[in-house]
Regions:
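Short alpha-helical transmembrane segments in multi-pass integral membrane proteins
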Residues: 1-23, 80-145, 193-250, 306-371, ...
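Structural signal for membrane-spanning alpha-helices in multi-pass inner-membrane proteins
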Residues: 114, 157, 183, 187, ...
């Protein structure tokens, strides 16, 4: 047994160098993003549960937008990662241009919804009038960010598949410092700025998104030499690439869209349990993100390496790499769980919130420290290995099936009908992570997941 365990980690030195070269910049980028989220929740938490809950629930609508773009970029990344493995730069440029046009449609749609129907959106998540009122102000401002954020998300997601990861780190780092400073100004009214409360966080986020957009646009137009995006491709339609995207990328988009709607249903359930539950989950989410930040880097690296390897038609090597990434996910997941359990008291102590909110956060963190082992495996396989291997139709089932058939109904019954303790409710809401991890592990081990989607 020990020899088997040791063998799965035995890879050529280049494997781990490639993995770390991708994972470390992404990890640092995610750390910066988590820093923004933590600063936001701490600043807004000092204003009370209403402000914190309003921003958290309004951001669920933004989360739908973001995950749709993760789906767009992830679906395209299945193609571009394998295009890069076979050395087809022109197809990568055409794919990126095609995705910008599709993104523009979603960006404008979400802008209209957020600008003109914010109250209706907030009522989906909570019946609390004070939370709705704060959320409306937040969402109206944040909706302008949709017009630029889609472009940035698509560009970063696809550029990662060809090994360009430092751009995201650079743009995120600059926007991070801008966001923290601007939030401090507009939330509390410092340096002569108006005191806007929760809406001030939206102003800071909007300006930082614009800065991020400008950095990425300047890079693509004036600096990039690797894939050489052509402006003229924006005005062309490549039928072959579009057909490939519809066949292999659409399942990713559909699964991510249905998944995010399901995750929003979980937020609706928590919203019906009160602002304390919402605020506690915001605190728990920050700690979970912090403790799994390296895992997310490894999961992204797995997608790049597997996609490039499959594109180069090295299928046996891709299968071996997949098993190594699975083993790494288990190890990192266990470490993350221990870290969450160890840091929960310290983390909760940072927040100036009510005692009941702290009690709920404590319960959620206990549950998360167990669930995170399974979510580590699930994230690495669904967003990295299996997706990059082209097994997108299987993943559409894995991402959606258990969330809608188990987690949402069980969570609703436990939280809204039976009013069970928060920790038990949270476990019910996350039960799909456990089953998905086991199902995807079985899929990986039967070696039926590799599909070269770039073959003519």
């Amino acid at each position: 047994m020990g020899d088997v365990e040791l063998t799965v980690f035995k890879r050529e030195n280049d494997f781990y160098k490639r993995m770390l070269a991708i994972a470390i910049p992404i990890t640092l980028q995610n750390l910066i993003t988590i820093g923004i989220n933590m600063a936001d929740t701490m600043m807004l938490g000092s204003l009370g549960e209403v402000a914190l809950s309003a921003s958290a629930l309004a951001n669920q609508f933004s989360f739908i937008f973001l995950v749709i773009h993760f789906g767009l970029a992830g679906g395209a990344g299945v193609l571009t990662g394998q295009f890069w493995g076979k050395g087809d730069k022109e197809s990568i440029s055409k794919t990126l241009s095609m995705m910008f046009k599709i993104s523009a449609v979603f960006s404008f749609t979400f802008f209209i919804l957020g600008q003109f129907f914010p109250a209706q959106i907030m009522r989906i998540y909570t019946p609390d009038p004070s939370v709705i009122a704060e959320g409306v102000k937040y969402l109206r401002i944040l909706s302008f960010a949709f017009l630029v954020q889609g472009f940035s998300t698509i560009a970063i997601g696809i550029l990662r598949t060809v090994g360009i990861v430092k751009l995201a780190l650079c743009s995120t780092a600059i926007s991070f410092f801008a966001n923290i400073f601007l939030n401090w100004m507009f939330i509390f009214g410092n340096l002569g700025a108006p005191r806007l409360g929760a809406a001030g966080a939206a102003v800071g986020t909007l300006i930082s998104r614009i800065i991020e957009f400008l950095i990425i646009a300047i890079y693509l137009v004036f600096i990039d030499k690797r894939i050489q995006v052509k402006i003229k491709d924006l005005f062309k339609h490549d039928k072959a690439i579009f057909t490939d995207y519809v066949k292999h990328g659409t399942p990713v988009l559909i699964s991510d869209f249905i998944l995010v709607i399901g995750l929003n249903m979980l937020s609706v359930i928590m919203g019906r349990m009160g602002s304390e539950m919402v605020a506690a989950n915001s605190i728990n989410t920050v700690l979970q993100q912090f403790c799994t930040v390296f895992l997310m880097g490894v999961a992204n690296a797995s997608g790049v390496i597997i996609g490039n390897t499959v594109g180069a038609k090295e299928y046996d090597k891709a299968q071996d790499y997949g098993k190594t990434f699975l083993a790494l996910a288990v190890l990192i997941g266990c470490f993350s769980g221990l870290l969450i359990f160890s840091l929960k008291n310290v983390m909760i102590g940072f927040y100036d919130v009510a005692g009941r909110t702290k009690d709920i956060a404590y319960q959620l963190m206990n549950t998360t420290s167990i669930i995170v082992v399974f979510s580590a495996v699930g994230s690495t396989l669904t967003k990295g290995v299996l997706r990059a291997g082209g097994d997108t139709k299987f993943l559409m089932k894995a991402d959606v099936l258990f969330l809608w058939l188990l987690a949402i109904p069980l969570g609703f019954i436990a939280g809204v009908v039976l009013n069970l303790p928060a920790g038990i409710v949270f476990f019910c809401l996350k039960i799909d992570e456990v089953i998905k991890a086991l199902w995807c592990t079985k899929r990986l081990l039967v070696d039926k997941w590799i599909k070269n989607v770039t073959l003519a």
